[in-house]
Swiss-Prot record:
Role, per record: Could have a role in the budding of coatomer-coated and other species of coated vesicles.
PANTHER family xrefs: TRANSMEMBRANE EMP24 DOMAIN-CONTAINING PROTEIN
SMART domains xref list: EMP24_GP25L
Record's GO cellular component terms: COPII-coated ER to Golgi transport vesicle; cytoplasmic vesicle membrane; endoplasmic reticulum; endoplasmic reticulum-Golgi intermediate compartment; Golgi apparatus
A UniProt-annotated Pfam family: EMP24_GP25L
Cytoplasmic-facing ranges: 194-205
Residue span, GOLD domain: 34-116
Protein name: Transmembrane emp24 domain-containing protein A
Signal peptide range in chain numbering: 1-24
Chain ranges on the Lumenal side, renumbered to this chain: 25-172
Encoding gene (name): empA
Protein's cellular compartments: Cytoplasmic vesicle membrane
Length: 205
């Protein structure tokens, strides 16, 4: 009996990595506009929302999480990035809103990752008051697996932001090089013209 129970716990732990919904978005929020992402989440599920402003102005934006009963469960102003983990009180559609209303001219590009956990036997074990040493170990490992998944998602988002920054820098360097080349060519043409005029005037004298 104990072996069967332990086997079930181990299988549940190994399946945690696949028993969650992970959605990733990159989108533009225009100036003076608010954009929202809607996700239906079941009752008593843990969900993690991660975002980063990867381009635009001072790379800041207002971020709000709204529950299905229209209650604001989190609100942050002028944030460049953030990670928020919550547990759903009841089932329904949650809203994740990004407001760029503070900006009158500049659009913002946002990278957003939403990870929603699924129910599993691990959750039922967590409700027990008295846990065996094996169950406590499984719970600790479960929390560790979830933390690693969230870190992977976070680094994926940061990698996208750094890639965007590198591409933007490369573009600026390219155009600056083109501008420098144009200036050098213009100066060379002017110097040739000036020297020719100088010697023509000197011969005439």
């Amino acid at each position: 009996m104990m072996n069967n129970k332990l086997l079930l716990l181990v299988i549940a732990l190994l399946c945690i990595a696949s028993n969650s919904i992970v959605e990733s978005f990159s989108f533009k929020v225009s100036a003076k506009v608010e954009e929202c992402i809607y996700e239906e989440i079941g009752v008593d599920l843990s969900f993690t929302a991660m975002f980063q402003v990867i381009q635009g102005g001072f790379n800041d934006i207002d971020f709000t999480i709204i529950s299905p009963d229209k209650r604001i469960v989190y609100s942050g102003q002028r944030e460049s990035e953030g990670t928020k983990t919550l547990r759903s009180s009841f089932a329904g559609v949650y809203s994740f809103c990004f407001s760029n209303k503070m900006s009158s001219l500049t659009d913002k590009t946002v990278s957003f990752i939403l990870s929603v956990g699924e129910s599993s036997p691990i959750r039922e074990i967590a409700k027990k008051k008295d846990l065996t040493p094996i169950e406590r170990s499984i719970m600790t490992l479960s929390d560790g697996v979830i933390a690693v998944k969230n870190e992977q998602n976070y680094f994926k988002m940061r990698e996208a932001a750094h890639r965007n920054t590198a591409e933007s820098t490369n573009s600026r360097v390219l155009w600056w090089s083109v501008f420098e080349a144009f200036v050098l060519i213009a100066l060379s043409i002017w110097q040739i013209y000036y020297l020719r005029r100088f010697f023509e005037v000197k011969r005439a004298v």
